[in-house]
Amino acid sequence: TLRVADKTVSGEGFSVSFDPKSGFIRSYRLRNVELLAGPLRPSFYRAATDNDLGVRQTGKYPDSRMWAGAEPELVNFTLTSGDGGAKAVADYTIPAVGAQLRLAYVIAADGSIRIGETMTADSARKDVADLMRFGMAFETPGMFDAVEYYGRGPMENYADRSGAAFVGRYAQRVADQFHMKYVSPQESGTRSGLRWWRLTDASGFGIEFCSDRHFSASAIPYAIPQLDNGSSEYVRHPGDLVPDGRTHVNIESVQSGLGCVNSWGRLPRPEYLLPYGDYSFNFLLQPVTGGR
């Protein structure tokens, strides 16, 4: 039986709480353990790669950094309960890019959450940059440091750089997801072609994601601002990075390709770009109880 009170849904061994100001899920407790160390929120930007910086420096295209500051503003939030579970709907505007966003949640009695993210673009806006990704992001406590998935691997891979990454089942550590051999910090650690992806602690306790289509995900010890402070001159070596004690997770339906043609202005091929437009992503978040 689900209980709904004060923007919190609780059931047998779990609770989900929504932030009253943002409408985002701010707490997900499973068997008295908090799984979130930051809200589950929309994600449109990635830390700039060397190729991204090369494109930016040409000045030929709208600056993708506008998506780093594309903060959704809550317009309306509803939370109801019924036979099919508890349902929450949050509607937003995104003033920086002129878009509308809806986040819809269905919380079941087993603690699983079906999440739908839908963005509607303003077709009159011609000044909006391509997206870098379309999905959601959150943080967990650092004890959630084991990744297991069925998808492309074992190395990081992207839409236009995945030919040598074969589909299989892989078990890895969060500490090993980030590629430390790039000269400067940048986007790293994504795995694509995912059928399912889970993040757990050493006992196998945590969360799992799946979707009705292939998706991408990453879990690294660093936040995007640690890798990219918005400046093209921001150069620091990966060895200088200090983990902040949390695991930083991105899960997305799509992410822009890397390009890898050159690093002084060439965009990725058109089929790997994410032009401003309408996007949607539907996925399931479910608990993994492991040995607990």
Where are these regions (language model features)?
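Beta-strand/loop-rich accessory regions of lumenal/periplasmic or secreted enzymes
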Residues: 1-292
